[in-house]
Amino acid sequence: MNINVAAFRTPPTKQTDHADQILGTDSESRRVFRNAMLQAIDMVVDQTAAASSLYSGTSFQGLRGLIDDLDPLPEVGTGIAAALAEIGRPALEHAMVVGHPAAMAHLHCPVAVPALAAEVLISATNQSLDSWDQSPFATLVEERVLACLTQLAELPASASGNFTSGGTQSNMTALYLAAVRCGPDARKAGVVLTSAHAHFSIRKSAAILGFAEDAVIAIAADADGRMSVPALKAELLRVAGEGRIPVAVVATAGTTDLGAIDPLVEIADLAAAQNVWMHVDAAYGGGLLFSRHRSRLEGLEHAHSITLDFHKMLFQPISCGVLLLRDRADFAPLASKADYLNPEDAVFADAPNLVERSMQTTRRADALKILMTMRAIGRDGLDALICQTLQNTHAAAEAVKTREYLSLAGPPSLSTVLFRYVSARGPKFADAITLKTRAALFNAGIAALATTVLDGRVHFKLTLLNPRSTPDVVHRILDAIGETARELETHHARP
């Protein structure tokens, strides 16, 4: 068939409305886009250069005042330049600077520049990964990246996956597919066995999926926070004896607080012996796949499903999650058909419609930023960055040991360090001082630290995901903790 393509080309027209605010093929919208991007880039670069602290210190009430004074929908628009100045500037000035070396509160990483460049392409092209005709090249990018990831995880040729909004969605999808595999009674009589230190999204996902309130069984952990294999074996036998259905065993490769990696090989053996779906939540520890420490994830290759989050250890902008399946055929329960989207009779022969592997319909082309990062930095570069963060973490733990006012909870597993402030006025008072110290350091823009509870006591937690969080930075933070905590002790009565 001969089609006159030229007849369908839109001739250039003079804009008489606001259409130049919508990126299109015309020269005016391209000019507007370029100017806006350059202004935004300059603002980010200028603010990064000016960021001497990781937070402005403005109170919640102060920020509320800034935003409450803004009319979000004026009758007449201000234009992009003014909007960027009015909104973009305070958004940058009062952001938490995740790239600051003293930002150590959460699994919230600084971002790789290649990924930021990819974000511009992703947003500007606005591809949607539900059907091939909405994302021709982006679909193939995701397929190629997933093939690379399944190889890194040492899964068989039958494996595949899909990109998700993050670990919670990946975990929920895995539990849903495991439940479907077990039949119609799975959610009524089924159980999910996981570590006592597993991410809360496992319990949350089970509740959303309609499992019974007591369906998630927390297996005891050893002193290092790893799931106890004997305890898991005993629970599997007990569940079978009660006539309940073991839907899945969920192992964790990198718990949120301790960074513990469950014994994956032994858990895989138990799951296989009982024909139970094994899911590995490697949202945190999965970054080791890109480093010389891949062997620490031995047993991952036996999983039915794997959660990965690249906005944790792999320096990706939020969000960037992945679910890998050992057998792509297990995605079948998600393969709904719609005549307008992915009809039974394929319009584009052999072209995949990735909606058939996802809980989402409309979905961003997030695989592009991973591909851009891997290509630009390479295997050796990613290994160096990850290893540097691990080295910094071990140095931080050693630094904690040298201070008599701090007590290290234990050696780090990945990139978290837990420790307590020690007070002569007792552990309860130390708990209160720890919480106040955390807030004081953040409000002063000195450091972003987390607190968590371990063995019933409040601990400081450092999460080192930035290669620039060097021992010198950590020493200054630990000194600031001591100075601030002692000052707070002198000004506060016993709780």
From Swiss-Prot:
PROSITE patterns: DDC_GAD_HDC_YDC. Keywords: Decarboxylase, Lyase, Plasmid, Pyridoxal phosphate. Pathway: Siderophore biosynthesis; rhizobactin biosynthesis. One of its GO terms (molecular function) is pyridoxal phosphate binding. The modification N6-(pyridoxal phosphate)lysine is found at K312. One of its GO terms (biological process) is rhizobactin 1021 biosynthetic process. Its cofactor is pyridoxal 5'-phosphate. Disulfide bonds: none annotated. Its EC number is 4.1.1.86. InterPro entries: PyrdxlP-dep_de-COase (IPR002129), PyrdxlP-dep_Trfase (IPR015424), PyrdxlP-dep_Trfase_major (IPR015421), PyrdxlP-dep_Trfase_small (IPR015422), Pyridoxal-P_BS (IPR021115). GO terms for cellular component: cytoplasm. The keyword Lyase applies. Belongs to the group II decarboxylase family. This is L-2,4-diaminobutyrate decarboxylase. The gene is rhbB.
